[in-house]
Amino acid sequence: MPSVMKCGYLATAGLIGICIHLWYFRYGEHHLYPWRYVRFHLCLTMGVSALLYAKKPPQYTLSPGDLVKDTCLLMVTYLIGLFTSLLLYRTLFHPLRQIRGPWAAKVSSFWLSFRLRRGPSFRILHELHEEYGPVVRVGPSEVSIIHPEAIGIIYGPNSRCSKNAFYDNGHPMMSLHSYRDRTAHDQRRRVWSAGFGDRALRGYEQRMRVYRQKLFQRLEERADAESTINISQWFNFYSYDTMGDLAFARSFDMLDASRNHWAVDMLMHGMIGYRYLFPSWFFRLLATMPSLSNDWHKFIGFATDTMLRRLREQVGVPDIFASLLAPLNGRDPTDDERNMLMGDAMLIITAGSDTTATSLTSIVYELARRPDEVDKLRAEIEPIEADSDGEYQHDTLAKLPHLNGFINEAFRLHSPIPGVIPRKTPPEGIHVKDIFIPGNMTVFSPQWSMGRSEAAYVDPAIFNPERWYKHIDLVKEKSVFAPFSIGPYSCIGKPLAMMNIRTTVARLIMRFDVRFPEGEDGIRWMDAADEHFAMGIHQMPVVLTRRH
C-alpha cells in the first residue's frame, strides 16, 4: 500500500478516535453493557481488515501478515486518537480542572483503585484531604468533600443529587438500595416501610432474641474457659444468623456450628471487588468472568434457591420479607419482580449483617479501652429490670442518654459505612461553601473523615459520650453525624439496627467485664479494618469475665 495512502488512513483513524471521544463518550452513561463495546471494537477490527483488503490497489499483493500488521496499526492509531483526546480533555478542559488533587486522578478512575491496594478508601481519602484540603478531585469526574455543609447538600432531604452509576453494579438485580430513579425508589421504600413499623419491630425482636440467647450462651462457655475470644467473629455469626432469619425465615446456623456458613464465605469473597471502587463499566465486565466472580454467583444461586423456598412458606411470626411479598397477593413474581426480591433479600443480609457486626465490634473496642465509661453505663442501666433471660425491654434502653451517647461516639469514630457513598450532582451543579461542583459529577463525603473534623466537632480525637446530651456545644454541626446516611436514601433499617445494638450492648456490659488480652490494646486490629462499602473488622480479641 502506498505510503501516502497509509498516512491518510492513519490520520483518518486517529481523527475517528478523537471524534468518538468528543461526541460520544463525553456524554451520557456507558457502563451497563461493557461487553457491547468489546464486541463493537472486535467487529470494527474485522471491518477495517476487510476494508483494507478490498481497497488495496490491484497491482499490490497484500499478504495475511501485512494485512494483520496494517489493521493493528490503524486500530492502535484510532485508540491513540481516542485516549489522547481523553487525556487532554480531562487534564486541561474538564469542568473539574480547577479542583485540587493528584494529577493521575484527573486522568483515570483506576488511579484510586490502584491506590486502594495500600488500604481501605476511608483511610486513603483521609490522607488525601490532609494533603489537598477539604475538597479533593479523586477521579476524572469524582470529588470528595469534607466540609460540614456537604452532608446536607449531597445527602439531605432537600438534596438535588441522585444516585450515580455505582448503584447499577448488580443490574438487572435491583434492591431498595440500588434504585436510582427517585420516584421508583420512593414507591419501593413505601413497601419496605410497612416492615419497619413499631408492631413489625416487636415481631422481629422475638426472632432476634432466639439468636441473642445463643450468642450469650457461646460467650459464657468461652468466658468460663477463660479463653481469648475473637468477639468480631461471634458478632458476625450472630448478625448473619439473625438477618438470614429475617430475610428468609431461615438461619445460617453459624452460632450452632461456630463457623461461617459456606454461602457466607462465598458472599465475603464475592464482595472483595467492592473494596477497589472500580469504575462501574469495569466492575460489570469483571462480574461476567466466571474465574473472577464464581464465588459471588454461587452465593446468588444459594440465595435464589432460599428465596424461592421462602415464597412457598407461611411463617408464624412475620419477617421483613413478608412485607416485601405482600404486594404479590399470593401470585408468582414476574422476572423483574424476582430480580427485585432477590436484590432486596441480598440487601437485608449484607447491609444488616456487616454493619451490625462492625458496629458491635467497634463498641466493644471502646468499652474495653474505657472502664470508667463502662461504670457509667452500668449505673445507668442497673435501675432497669431485666427478664429471666437477662434481656431488657428496648423501649427503656432507648431513653438512656449515656448509652445512646456512647453508641453515637462509636459511630462517629468508627462509622459502619466510613468511605464512599456516591451521589451524582444535578445538571445545574451544586455549591458547597465557595466551591462550585458542575453537573453530572460524582461527589461524596466520607463519614470517617467527617467524624474527625474540627469544623464539625470540638476535640474530635477525644471519645466523649457526653457531647451528645450534656455538653452539646462540643458538636458544632450535628447534621454532619450520619452513620445511617440522611435524606430520602437513608437506611430504612435504622430502627431495627439500633434496637439490636442497644439490647446487645446492655446485656453484654451487665453480664461481663470486658478487657483486652495481656499486651493488647485493640488498636492494631482497628487499623487492620477492611472495607467493601461497609467496614469489616475481622479480628478483635478480648477476654470476657462473668460478673455474677
UniProtKB/Swiss-Prot annotation:
InterPro entries: Cyt_P450, Cyt_P450_E_grp-I, Cyt_P450_sf, Cytochrome_P450_monoxygenase. It is a multi-pass membrane protein. Coiled coil: none annotated. Its main location: membrane. It comes from the Eukaryota. Its EC number is 1.14.14.118. The chain crosses the membrane at residues 5-25, 35-54, 73-93. Heme binds at residue 491. It catalyses: tryprostatin B + reduced [NADPH--hemoprotein reductase] + O2 = 6-hydroxytryprostatin B + oxidized [NADPH--hemoprotein reductase] + H2O + H(+). Its cofactor is heme. It is found in: Membrane. GO terms for biological process: alkaloid metabolic process; small molecule biosynthetic process. Cytochrome P450 monooxygenase; part of the gene cluster that mediates the biosynthesis of fumitremorgins, indole alkaloids that carry not only intriguing chemical structures, but also interesting biological and pharmacological activities. The biosynthesis of fumitremorgin-type alkaloids begins by condensation of the two amino acids L-tryptophan and L-proline to brevianamide F, catalyzed by the non-ribosomal peptide synthetase ftmPS/ftmA. PANTHER family: CYTOCHROME P450, L-ORNITHINE-N5-MONOOXYGENASE (EUROFUNG). This is Tryprostatin B 6-hydroxylase. It comes from Neosartorya fischeri (strain ATCC 1020 / DSM 3700 / CBS 544.65 / FGSC A1164 / JCM 1740 / NRRL 181 / WB 181) (Aspergillus fischerianus). The lineage of its organism: Eukaryota, Fungi, Dikarya, Ascomycota, Pezizomycotina.
